[in-house]
Swiss-Prot record:
GO molecular function: zinc ion binding
Source organism: Mus musculus (Mouse)
Sequence positions bearing N6-acetyllysine: 564
Lineage, highest ranks first: Eukaryota, Metazoa, Chordata, Craniata, Vertebrata
Protein name in UniProt: Protein transport protein Sec23B
Functional note: Component of the coat protein complex II (COPII) which promotes the formation of transport vesicles from the endoplasmic reticulum (ER). The coat has two main functions, the physical deformation of the endoplasmic reticulum membrane into vesicles and the selection of cargo molecules for their transport to the Golgi complex.
Length: 767
């Protein structure tokens, strides 16, 4: 077993890929009987300090319908200088530059350790990075001041040749001219009128040099100053002026009467930002960064009226079809998101307010373009300030951890087809023989566009086996998949990262144990969870839970060992043993349970779940719990109410929150001030240890989690109590004896009851 775990670990570290199955069933029928689809989690730009990019272009297969890239799985005839493509078997000539290759002098892309390789493309004009700030001015004074300071700080973090623009909005929308003369000029647009891209470009005077739409290319350097210099300027030229301009920003001057919301034209402001970049820099790396402190209340994209007595829509309103602005607003933002994705730009949303800001309607903007979504209470909190600062963090080479305008192309050997992808991407509608008719996620294509990428951005990619049951893949063969990610690096170079992997085929009837041993239950749980969350966007919550339950029961029936009608005989092997508890916690998670969460919160949680890597996704599904005591070093404990003991401190990491919880006795000792007495030095250290560990997590994570410090009986202890498995409740407390954790006041079923029920259904011949 350890060997497969090591194999999975090594592949993730080298290639950024985790497959649900690491030995593949050799026919379509057998693959469907496996219940969990053949799929993988791919982190296209996983950080690899040991992988410097090579300074030449990749060698492509000459077959026009294939164009796979030369890789270690290809067969090479060194004497004839020919190579055979491992996907279509086409024989190809090596280019002249490869004349000196031999068995002992191989290029990097043929060496097995370079199953992932990155190429640096030298040709083609380079375009600077573009950052367009879209700022809400209907904020409270201290909030606006804090936001202005964060924006001024961010200017110092941008590369000097980056282009920057500024749009502000309240009741009206202002597009600011950024000149070096120090005179403030802006174009003002009504916040109620929807404008086409052409109208926006005409009004801003961008049409003379705006390129014909069919020329999908970046503006050439000599065109750029004329086209956009008034609105997008290199930071090194206007740093001082823009800092002053941001400092002078005032609150929206339109009066807001009592009982009314400010009039916010978010939809028009975003539309103008998209139109401005569309006309000046199509297919160039650009970020639209929207900062908003409340819901859009007028014009296209409004999500609530200005009357405060009318609350913004809740889940209850949506279920009752009582959210009157939702469909129209969602349509507006979807149209903007699709236009932005077509142009290769991405949209970030930074929403800080105590009430909802319309993230439900606007979620498609970051979701489809690979932008960030940050949600907080105020721009004046360290949560926002540090999260915003982290966007501009640098990697080991001193480059930004951001990439732009990526396309992901997936190629498969002929026994496989691509069913779809789930992640921050849009389809490029590239059909081909390797595209399946059955869609899972965003399907019907073998290529996707990801406009904004960072080293942790992860996609779930789903496949299906082609071969019929009566003509399975021959034994001993290997199936192969190649992932080709072309992107604009933050240094503005064009790069291509290529990952080529292979796995063995096995006959599911004679080698089921072999397939079973190669099951990656962590990857499978995340891939199934992504499918569930994807379905939850368009289906009723209970239907999604029923679907997940059915899949779990079928999986247990297929791979469990049991005697018919005898639940006590049920066993799962080590490679499946954790999977049911992942599903138990997933069912209770905020991704599938909307109770107690606003529509905006649900959208925020789902946004992050659909893009994080495997480790972070597992923390979201099943939070990690550490226990601190006098009995030894901190240790991970079960996410269970039995772990909540009076003489322990607990640290829980849910990804979105870090909770420190003091047990009853510890809380009393702290209240009595023992930590300040020299003879109780060890107690002081015990209190400090979880704080230090929490600080470490807070420093590393994006977005920065909410930090909660609570104790037994504290109101915020609910964050911990709602996550742990309620093995002890008010119903069964007295059956447990005395010193065993805290009872949870809930009617939710515990993991034990869930497992008992699962065993009963799995062994029943009726189900």
């Amino acid at each position: 077993m350890a060997t497969y775990l090591e194999f999975i670990q090594q592949n993730e570290e080298r290639d950024g890929v985790r497959f649900s199955w690491n030995v593949w069933p050799s026919s379509r029928l057998e693959a469907t009987r496996m219940v969990v689809p053949l799929a993988c989690l791919l982190t296209p730009l996983k950080e690899r300090p040991d992988l410097p990019p090579v300074q030449y272009e990749p060698v492509l297969c000459s077959r026009p319908t294939c164009k796979a890239i030369l890789n270690p799985l290809c067969q090479v005839d060194y004497r004839a200088k020919l190579w055979a493509c491992n996907f279509c078997f086409q024989r190809n000539q090596f280019p002249p530059a490869y004349a000196g290759i031999s068995e002992v002098n191989q290029p990097a892309e043929l060496m097995p350790q370079f199953s992932t390789i990155e190429y640096m493309i030298q040709r083609g004009a380079r375009s600077p990075l573009i950052f367009l700030y879209v700022v809400d001015t209907c904020l409270e004074e201290d909030d606006l001041q804090a936001l202005k300071e964060s924006l001024q700080m961010s200017l110092s973090l941008l590369p000097p040749d980056a282009l920057v623009g500024l749009i502000t909005f309240g009741r009206m929308v202002q597009v600011h001219e950024l000149s070096c003369e120090g005179i403030s000029k802006s174009y003002v647009f009504r916040g109620t009128k929807d404008l086409t891209a052409k109208q926006i470009q005409e009004m801003l005077g961008l049409t003379k040099s705006a390129m014909p739409v069919q020329q999908a290319r970046p503006a050439q350097p000599q065109e750029q100053p004329f086209v956009s210099s008034r609105f997008l300027q290199p930071i090194h030229k206007i740093d001082m002026n823009l800092t002053d301009l941001l400092g002078e920003l005032q609150r929206d001057p339109w009066p807001v009467t009592q009982g009314k919301r400010p009039l916010r034209s978010t939809g028009v402001a975003l539309s103008i930002a998209v139109g401005l970049l569309e006309g000046t820099f199509p297919n160039t790396g650009a970020r639209i960064m929207l900062f908003t402190g409340g819901p859009p209340t007028q014009g296209p994209g409004m999500v609530v009226g200005d009357e405060l007595k009318t609350p913004i829509r809740s889940w209850h309103d949506i279920e009752k079809d009582n959210a009157r602005f939702m469909k129209k607003a969602t349509k507006h933002y979807e149209m903007l998101a699709n236009r932005t994705a077509t142009n290769g730009h991405c949209i970030d949303i930074y929403a800080c307010a105590l009430d909802q800001t319309g993230l439900l309607e606007m979620k498609c903007c970051p979701n489809l373009t690979g932008g960030h979504m940050v949600m907080g209470d105020s721009f004046n909190t360290s949560l926002f300030k540090q999260t915003f600062q982290r966007i501009f963090s640098k990697d080991f080479n001193g480059d930004f951890r951001m990439a732009f305008g990526a396309t992901l192309d997936v190629k498969t050997s002929r026994e496989l087809k691509i069913a779809g992808a789930i992640g921050p991407c849009v389809s490029l509608n590239v059909k081909g023989p390797c595209v399946s008719e059955n869609e899972l996620g965003v399907g019907g294509t073998s290529q996707w566009k990801i406009c904004g990428l960072d080293p942790s951005s992860t996609l779930g990619i789903y496949f299906e086996v082609v071969n019929q049951h009566n003509a399975p893949v021959p034994q001993g063969g290997r199936g192969a998949i190649q992932f080709v990610t072309q992107y604009q690096h933050s240094s503005t170079q064009k790069r291509i990262r290529v990952t080529t992997i292979a796995r063995n085929w096995a006959d599911a009837q004679s080698q089921l144990r072999h397939i079973e041993a190669a099951f990656d239950q962590e990857a499978a749980a995340v891939l199934m969870a992504r499918l569930g969350v994807f379905r939850a966007e368009s289906e009723e919550g209970p239907d999604v839970l029923r679907w997940l339950d059915r899949q779990l029961i079928r999986l247990c029936q297929k791979f469990g060992q049991y005697n018919k009608e005898d639940p006590t005989s049920f066993r799962l092997s080590d490679s499946f043993s954790l999977y049911p508890q992942f599903m138990f916690h997933l069912r209770r998670s905020p991704f599938l349970q909307v109770f107690n969460n606003s529509p905006d919160e649900s959208s925020y949680y789902r946004h992050h779940f659909a893009r994080q890597d495997l480790t972070q996704s597992l923390i979201m599904i099943q939070p990690i719990l550490y226990s601190y005591s006098f009995h030894g070093p901190p240790e991970p404990v079960l996410l269970d109410s039995s772990s909540i003991l009076a003489d322990r401190i607990l640290l829980m990491d849910t990804f979105f929150q870090i909770v420190i919880y003091l047990g009853e006795t510890i809380a009393q000792w702290r209240k009595a001030g023992y930590q300040d007495m020299p003879e109780y030095e060890n107690f002081k250290h015990l209190l400090q240890a979880p704080l230090d560990d929490a600080q470490e997590i807070l420093q590393a994570r994006f977005p920065m989690p909410r930090y909660i410090n609570t104790e037994h009986g504290g109101s915020q202890a609910r964050f911990l109590l709602s996550k742990v498995n309620p093995s002890q409740t008010h119903n069964n407390l007295y059956a447990w004896g005395q010193e065993t954790g805290a009872p949870i006041l809930t009617d939710d079923v515990s993991l034990q009851v869930f497992m008992d029920h699962l065993k009963k259904l799995a062994v029943s011949s009726a189900s």
